[in-house]
Amino acid sequence: MGEMEIMAVLKAALAVTAAVALILLMSYWAAGRARPLLDASARDALVKQGLAYQFIDLAAGTVHYRLEGPANGPLVVLVHGFSTPSFVWNDYFEPLTRAGYRVLAYDNYGRGFSDRPKGPYNADLSDTLLVNLLAALAPNEKVDLIGYSMGGATVTIFASRHADVVRSLTLIAPAGLGSVTDSKIELLKRPLIGDWIVRMFGLKIFHGAAAEDAKAAPNPARFLADFDRQMDYRGYGEALLSTLRTYPLGTSEAAYATAGASARPVMVIWGEADKTVPFAQSKALMALMPNARLYSYEKFGHNITFTQSELVSGLIKQFLASLEAKPDQPAQTAQPTQTAK
């Protein structure tokens, strides 16, 4: 093959490569704009349809929240996990408000009906959201924080930074105490290729994972519909990807140690069949929070929050009631560790 022929082949190869790259770039760009923005008109429509509650403008964007219960009741704040927004707490409002508590749940940035700022979606962003939200809705109040999965890490980090605001912690299958090796997640963390996968296929991936969780929910169809609705708007996949890359999902031990050094009451609830945040990590948690009360359940997994809401809300009410006991009427205390079969 002569020099001219070699040059022709190289030019053809470069042309094909450039064409493929352009196609990939255009598909990436188009996929990012295939869904509408979550703007004021979209939120108004959600409220009119009875799908959303209240909104508030905070430093990094608009936040969707639900606040119910007696105005003078102790404030209980419910913090959701990595991908499922605040609807995961829907079954907790009735029992907790009936017990006299004011209950607040909200969508973290990038989830549910809250804004999708550019990020990074790290611990500082979620912490600032909660700081700003409490300053706006409950200034100068002490709160009882309840966190599920990544929300467990969020409330623990908050307690380690703002100890004077937190009366108690309830941690349900809390993340932040060790990483679970997953080749798929490691692939998503890689620059460029992870961005492209999430932009092109991320919503299908997240829907598939939610569909598995929904099978055990009391109302699977309702759960999946509520989960999918947040994906109707631009930015959800990118928010989760940024969280995977920048949030200390497996490396929050220092915050647990700081929060655990306090005399603040802590309750931990965990399913021993949890494959997302393995129950084995409870050993590390109890070493960092030796005064915590641990309740574990052999047959339940990571979805214990929404599959066993009656059980979990009952434990929460019992725990919170113990904080309200009068000095001359001591509350019934649980053993530091309790395992239920």
Regions found by a protein language model. Give the residues of each.
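Flexible "cap/lid" loop of the alpha/beta hydrolase fold
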Residues: 160, 168-199
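Alpha/beta-hydrolase fold catalytic core
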Residues: 2-74, 98-101, 253, 321-341
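Short beta-strand/loop motif that positions the catalytic acidic residue
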Residues: 262, 268-270, 274
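Conserved alpha/beta-hydrolase catalytic His-Asp/Glu region
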Residues: 33-35, 185-186, 199-261
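Active-site loop/oxyanion-hole signature of alpha/beta-hydrolase fold enzymes
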Residues: 52-61, 66, 98, 108-146, ...
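Conserved HGGG/HGGXW glycine-rich cap/lid loop of the alpha/beta-hydrolase fold
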Residues: 61, 68-113
